[in-house]
Swiss-Prot record:
Enzyme class: lyase
Domain (YjeF C-terminal): residue spans on this chain: 5-269
UniProt: AMP binding residues: G211
Catalytic function, reaction form: (6S)-NADHX + ADP = AMP + phosphate + NADH + H(+); (6S)-NADPHX + ADP = AMP + phosphate + NADPH + H(+)
Molecular function GO labels: ADP-dependent NAD(P)H-hydrate dehydratase activity; ATP binding; NAD(P)HX epimerase activity
Gene that this sequence comes from: nnrD
PROSITE patterns attached to this UniProt entry: YJEF_C_2, YJEF_C_3
Listed cofactors: Mg(2+)
The protein's name in its UniProt record: ADP-dependent (S)-NAD(P)H-hydrate dehydratase
């Protein structure tokens, strides 16, 4: 199993070229946050924007719009109850995150199916939180888009039921044709025959919303990097690396504090020579 290291980060995060514009840094759709869990959508969106995604749009319950756009005015918004509008816009995005705070009711399942059905082979879809639970029911067709799952331990137990003959996480990743970010104290990433282990993290990060921030960082960086797996690995590293640094002076590290530091550390790693 390969280690995710600071040296690798220096190669994964490119400097920004002068002759570029917001369209060059990815168009991201985040489908998240029902009436009860709007904070999940906000934390994911904040991490996505601050990881450098060029254009970020959130599809959520309309009650979340004022809070979202007050905190993150850079985000655009789609009322996900207008399912026709959402359906028409799905194809416009490079990367889609679905699941944080989405809920498990019939409407959440309808939206989830819509996103999978409308996604194309040219898109990346990250499935997090409630999205994993819905997908694990086994009632959804495998979409044309490339999938990444971000399960914690409980969600992992549900997800691996889809691959009953699998022995290892690599077996599961191959069986469901997806990348798996298996979250834990030392998060592991499985993609095809390859596997990586993160070397950073701290119990100070054990607080609600941390997974939403990681998912937002993944979709933000995946939208910018040449290879999706590179963006995924970079996000896993940065999320824990920043958390560990902040924990040196904090008993608990909040997800929003990690998001706030993303631009600073992205700049540091983008300007550090990997051979130094």
């Amino acid at each position: 199993m390969k280690k995710i290291t600071p040296k690798a980060m220096c190669a994964w995060i490119p400097k920004r070229e002068d002759e570029t514009h917001k369209g060059d840094y990815g168009r991201v759709l985040i489908v998240a946050g029902n009436k009860q869990f709007g904070g999940a959508a906000i934390m994911a969106a904040e991490a996505c924007v601050k990881s450098g995604a060029g254009l970020t749009t959130v599809a959520s319950d309309s009650v979340n719009r004022p809070a979202l756009q007050t905190r993150i005015p850079e985000c655009m918004f789609i009322d996900y109850e207008n399912i026709t509008s959402l359906s028409e816009q799905i194809s416009q995005f490079d990367t889609i995150l679905i699941g944080p705070g989405l809920g498990l009711d019939a409407y959440a399942e309808e939206i989830f199916r819509l996103v999978l059905q409308k996604s194309t082979e040219h898109q990346q879809v990250i499935i997090d939180g409630d999205g994993i639970t819905i997908y694990a029911k086994g009632e959804n067709p495998h979409p044309a888009a490339k999938l990444t799952f971000t399960p914690h331990a409980g969600e992992w137990e549900r997800l691996k039921v889809l691959a009953p003959d699998a022995v290892t996480p690599t077996d599961v990743a191959l069986a469901i044709d997806a990348t798996i970010v298996l979250k834990g104290h030392r998060t592991k990433v499985y993609s095809g025959e390859s596997a990586w282990q993160n070397m950073y993290g701290t119990p100070a990060m054990a607080t609600g919303g941390m997974g939403d921030t990681l998912a937002g960082t993944i979709c933000g960086l995946m939208a910018q990097t040449e290879k999706p797996i590179t963006g995924t690995l970079a996000a896993v590293f940065l999320h824990s690396y920043i958390g560990e640094i902040l924990a040196k002076k904090r008993y608990v590290v909040l997800p929003t504090e990690i998001a706030e530091e993303l631009p600073t550390y992205l700049k540091i790693f983008s300007e550090t020579d990997e051979h130094a």
